[in-house]
Structure formats: C-alpha cells, structure tokens
Amino acid sequence: MVDKIIFTVTPIFSIPPRGAVAVETWMYQVAQRTNFPNRIVCIKNPGYSNYTFVNDNCSIHRVGFSRIYKRLFQKWTRLDPLPYSQRILNIAHDFPITKESVIVVHNSMKLYTQIRKRAPQARVVIHMHNAFEPKLLEQNVKMIVPSLYLKKYYQSYLANADIEIVPRLAP
C-alpha cells in the first residue's frame, strides 16, 4: 500500500505550467486530486517561487540552479556536486518517506537511473508517456504507461518488467 508519493519530471518546465506542457499538466492534475500526501518536485523557472502549497495533500517544491552553478558544474566541468536527482532525494528525505512511499519519475529514463543509483533502496516507478528505447532501464523495472500499445512496446524490450496501464483521462 502506498502512503506517500513524490512526483518528479525532467528539469525543463515548472509546475503548474504556463503553456501547453502535457506531462507536467497531467502530473499537476493527478497530484492535486490524490487523497494521500504527495509532493511534486520540478525545476524552478523564472517567475516561480521555491514552494507552493496546493492543498492539504499536495505541495510543489521547485529546485533552482544559479547561472554560475549551471555554467561551472553542468556545462564546463560536468562535475555536478549536487545534481537534480540528489535534490529530489533531499526533498523526499524531508517529506519524510517510509518503506511504503513511492517516487514516480515521469518520462525520463536518465533521471530514473540517477535516482536508482543514488537511492537503491527507494521504491521508484517510471511513468512513461512516450515510446523510447529503454536502454537505461533494468529488466525488472516497475513502470506505468497510459496505453496497451506502450505496455506491449516496453514488454518487448523488458520481459521481466512490472508494467501497469493507467489511462490518461482528461482533467
């Protein structure tokens, strides 16, 4: 039984999005309707606060990177001392998560792999909204997909994966 969820996505758009951003919009809609405690962790774009209270069960935590940090650690040296994946885990640790808590990574195999490496004991699920070749995923991955097509697609690569279909319903 799941008692808490951390929703996260690639560090491109802040949540709630100010434009047509399907994955981020879907995640925001689901998180605010979920009946148990959850957190959304996303990147902090200009004009957004670090934290937003949504309701009693949901809040948004935005991770910011300074221009100097991005330039020095992410572009020049590629030696990122506190990457996005670790910042997500720090927020999860402050939640505090339990053995029943789940981190749901949306549409990013790279981010999923980074979180798994940094927290192998954590219950991490990847929610794939698109068909990408799963080169970075382990064979026994736990995955959520929105369609039978995607379930069959990923099962053709990952025979031992635990894949569940959760259809996308219009908010």
Regions found by a protein language model. Name each.
Residues 70-102:
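An amphipathic, basic-hydrophobic alpha-helix
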Residues 84-85, 104-110, 128:
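Short His-centered aromatic/hydrophobic patch
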Residues 4, 101-102, 142:
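Structural motif
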Residues 2-20, 24:
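Nucleotide-activated donor-dependent transferases that construct or modify glycoconjugates
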Residues 9-17, 33-76:
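N-terminal strand-loop element at the rim of the active site
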Residues 48-55, 112-119, 132-140, 154-157:
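Short loop/helix-cap segments at secondary-structure boundaries that form the rim of catalytic
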Residues 133, 140-171:
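Donor nucleotide-sugar binding/catalytic pocket of nucleotide-sugar-dependent glycosyltransferases
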